[in-house]
């Protein structure tokens, strides 16, 4: 059920353009990272507090591997004075409120709405986000240096991505089985779609997405070219013989 929702609801074009646009400048990347920091902090705080039989076992099993807010705080510190210098924007605040509302409803009825939010963000990170670390460094060097962005690094869990994703799918299915009714399962699906809409709002809030994405792509190309120029030059045959 959730897998089909992912395919139908995931606006890959907007996600891709929004991510590319975040590479247009260090300042724009800082704003994007701050938005993700605020979103993940809200989501992980709600997951930490969750007692629903559909949510708590999932987070108990995977929270240590999936948690991103600590890494995002470090990434933000690389490019901004503090998170307080980038408070939540209106779109980010709306997203945070939706997450908190989902957690409150789950607390009331034992539902699994928070699973929908976790599904949206963590699968995006595992399926695509891990491949964005190097492009981010190329585009924004030297402000974003080696070993960063940290929030794309899932350690051993990410290194075994296929097996980890299969375990996550199994856990989500178990969460669905723990829900008491078809209506409760449908509420999770609706929350996934809501989470996607909030992500699109955050990714596009700053505007100029296409031009920002083009600038980000240009920064990436320039960064790759600079990296190649800095590589040690192999000696020509005549030089080696001299």
Give the role of each language-model region.
Residues 1-242:
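Metal- and O2-centered redox machinery and metal/ROS homeostasis
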């Amino acid at each position: 059920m959730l897998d089909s929702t992912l395919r139908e609801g995931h606006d890959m074009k907007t996600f891709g353009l929004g991510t590319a646009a975040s590479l247009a400048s260090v300042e724009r990347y800082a704003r994007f990272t701050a938005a993700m920091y605020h979103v993940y902090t809200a989501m992980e705080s709600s997951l930490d507090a969750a007692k629903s039989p559909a949510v708590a076992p999932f987070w108990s099993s995977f929270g240590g591997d999936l948690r991103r807010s600590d890494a995002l705080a470090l990434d933000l510190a690389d490019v901004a004075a503090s998170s307080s210098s980038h408070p939540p924007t209106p779109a980010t605040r709306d997203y945070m409120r939706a997450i908190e509302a989902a957690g409150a409803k789950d607390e009331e009825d034992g539902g699994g709405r928070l699973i929908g939010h976790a599904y949206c963000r963590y699968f995006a990170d595992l399926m695509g986000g891990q491949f964005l670390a190097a492009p981010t460094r190329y585009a924004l060097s030297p402000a974003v240096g080696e070993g960063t962005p940290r929030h794309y690094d899932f350690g051993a869990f990410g290194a075994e991505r296929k097996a980890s994703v299969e375990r996550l799918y199994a856990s989500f299915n178990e969460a669905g089985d723990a829900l008491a009714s078809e209506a409760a399962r449908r509420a999770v699906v609706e929350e996934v779609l809501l989470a996607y809409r909030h992500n699109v709002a955050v990714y596009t809030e700053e505007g100029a997405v296409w031009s920002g994405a083009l600038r980000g792509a240009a920064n990436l190309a320039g960064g790759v070219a600079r990296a190649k120029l800095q590589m040690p030059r192999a000696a020509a045959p005549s030089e080696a013989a001299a």
